[in-house]
Amino acid sequence: DDHDAHGEDDDDHVENNSEVHDDHDAHGEDDDDHDDHDDHDEEGHEEDLAFDPHSWLDPLAFKAQVNLVLENLTTLFPGQEATFKANAAAYIAQLDGLHTDYEAAFSDTGTCSNSTVVANHAAYNYMANRYDIEFITVHGVDPEGEPTAEDVAMAVEYLQEEDVSVFYIEEFTSPDAVKSIVDQTTSSAMPSGVSIQYLYTMELPPSNSDDDYLSLMQKNLVNLKAGLGC
């Protein structure tokens, strides 16, 4: 598709992080090829997840981590087992509710028929895998450093060539780079430039000290839905 073709030209700047979605495009092909596609997609996802540490962006994966913490705490402090279990159960119920909210948007019967997201940070493979969201990463403007003018120009080129109207930015991305991208994507079709929506990976403490995992994951969901129009 167009995204893949562009990726061949600029491998260092654009990456499709959710190869598993290729099998949805291939449903119309011969059944004999279906297993091969599934095998390829599973291998691609295993490779993506192996190099992506952001497992907590999948609420069910995070729930497994909570259970692991619970197991270790009750081993270390058996006298507090009842308290630990009660607290864990209450928190897990909230994680299950969060998962339900994401499924309401991104399941087969969810409200978001479009689930292709163009982002600036390759951090969302676990979320993509759980909720069938396709994340396309535009490299060079990630939050780890200050993007160069060339990095910004490459991002702008991709956004314009692919008619991207919404760009998802990780919270701590350079504000100057974000402003430059918006300014350079201004056109008659987008008088205000590309729309920016923020996503929170929680690699650093939140800028708002009142936020926590649950509130930031809800913000991620709200912003995903806002950008996708669902």
Q: Model features per residue range: what roles?
A:
Residues 1-230:
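Extracytoplasmic metal-acquisition and chelation regions
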